[in-house]
Amino acid sequence: MEVIHLGAEHSLLNRFVMEMRDVTIQNDRLRFRRNIERVGEVMAYEISKKMTQQVRTVTTPLGEAECSVPQDKVVLATILRAGLPFHHGFLNYFDYCENAFVSAYRKYKDRLNFDIHIEYIASPDITDKVLIISDPMLATGSSMELAYKALLTKGNPKHIHIASIIASQQAVDYIRGVMPDNTTIWIAAIDPTIDEHSYIVPGLGDAGDLAYGEKL
């Protein structure tokens, strides 16, 4: 299993993450969603480098050219609702791919304690395909684990890519312990801890609320 920390490469990606974190800039919902989408586009490009390539010959107006292109069948999956703009970023690049959606939410027992519930899944067959699961925030890793297990009811993928914008170190360690060896984890930023409410610190707040408004 490989963990790829894209933020450590000091690229323009870090500006998108910085704007999402900034308490003033993040209040612009359109810009916040677009920055999530941009990170998805960057990660889609990086993930494509890991895929099996096929050389195809195409005819141009002046002759023929050989082009190396990814040949894997890809399924893009995300966890609703915060994952939607992230998913759109991936879909902008993997526009030919199939899509899957999982609904996961926190069911609180009291102010601090909760369980993660999976309520809805819509997915094609993922057998022998490359599965990319995107969720902008990876706080504990529990939602990602349950989403993956739910998707396994639709087949066994060839390879799994876990994509997140900000993850806690705890979540990265947890995912490494519960996911199979044919998994690659992609992170834009790794933060040191989570608070008593299981929010990433320093993080950026509630990504779903920032993108779409507060929920009741």
UniProtKB/Swiss-Prot annotation:
<comment type="function">
    <text>Catalyzes the conversion of uracil and 5-phospho-alpha-D-ribose 1-diphosphate (PRPP) to UMP and diphosphate.</text>
</comment>
<keyword id="KW-0547">Nucleotide-binding</keyword>
<keyword id="KW-0342">GTP-binding</keyword>
<dbReference type="Pfam" id="PF14681">
    <property type="entry name" value="UPRTase"/>
</dbReference>
<comment type="similarity">
    <text>Belongs to the UPRTase family.</text>
</comment>
<dbReference type="InterPro" id="IPR029057">
    <property type="entry name" value="PRTase-like"/>
</dbReference>
<comment type="pathway">
    <text>Pyrimidine metabolism; UMP biosynthesis via salvage pathway; UMP from uracil: step 1/1.</text>
</comment>
<dbReference type="GO" id="GO:0005525">
    <property type="term" value="F:GTP binding"/>
</dbReference>
<feature type="binding site">
    <location>
        <begin position="135"/>
        <end position="143"/>
    </location>
    <ligand>
        <name>5-phospho-alpha-D-ribose 1-diphosphate</name>
    </ligand>
</feature>
<keyword id="KW-0460">Magnesium</keyword>
<dbReference type="GO" id="GO:0004845">
    <property type="term" value="F:uracil phosphoribosyltransferase activity"/>
</dbReference>
<feature type="binding site">
    <location>
        <position position="81"/>
    </location>
    <ligand>
        <name>5-phospho-alpha-D-ribose 1-diphosphate</name>
    </ligand>
</feature>
<feature type="binding site">
    <location>
        <position position="200"/>
    </location>
    <ligand>
        <name>uracil</name>
    </ligand>
</feature>
<dbReference type="InterPro" id="IPR000836">
    <property type="entry name" value="PRibTrfase_dom"/>
</dbReference>
<keyword id="KW-0328">Glycosyltransferase</keyword>
<protein>
    <recommendedName>
        <fullName>Uracil phosphoribosyltransferase</fullName>
        <ecNumber>2.4.2.9</ecNumber>
    </recommendedName>
</protein>
<keyword id="KW-0808">Transferase</keyword>
<keyword id="KW-0021">Allosteric enzyme</keyword>
<feature type="binding site">
    <location>
        <begin position="205"/>
        <end position="207"/>
    </location>
    <ligand>
        <name>uracil</name>
    </ligand>
</feature>
<dbReference type="GO" id="GO:0044206">
    <property type="term" value="P:UMP salvage"/>
</dbReference>
<feature type="binding site">
    <location>
        <position position="106"/>
    </location>
    <ligand>
        <name>5-phospho-alpha-D-ribose 1-diphosphate</name>
    </ligand>
</feature>
<feature type="binding site">
    <location>
        <position position="206"/>
    </location>
    <ligand>
        <name>5-phospho-alpha-D-ribose 1-diphosphate</name>
    </ligand>
</feature>
